[in-house]
């Protein structure tokens, strides 16, 4: 969406290359429609591959294994899972103007709240404890991306103890004419 035309206005304009394999060679720049179709195809394949995702039967499994087995299939809310793929399919289909398909995928994801898989956040958790409020509505997180170097990145770019020239900040000159 950021690097191409407004899809609803001209989906046939060139947008970005699409890589479905690791390569050192540049791929051709595709139209927004071609990119969207490839995204949908990849997500549909992911949906099929995740058909037996434990999130569907056991929920998010947000704790470590108690029997010493691998945690690879646990913490499903923090990994790309079946419902996260469906949410992305809803989003892409809505972007493409396929409202019926978008509605079907979104409805399937919303139904998980009734099943206790991704329940809507409890108001008391948001405002109940000033010391530890749930400001990200963690029960509603469908998947997350993690950068293990986040604290280092923050220190390098945003730590106020660094010299002003080495901290990302808004330049006052940009705020005036």
Give a label for each model feature.
Residues 1-177:
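Structured, solvent-exposed acidic/aromatic patches
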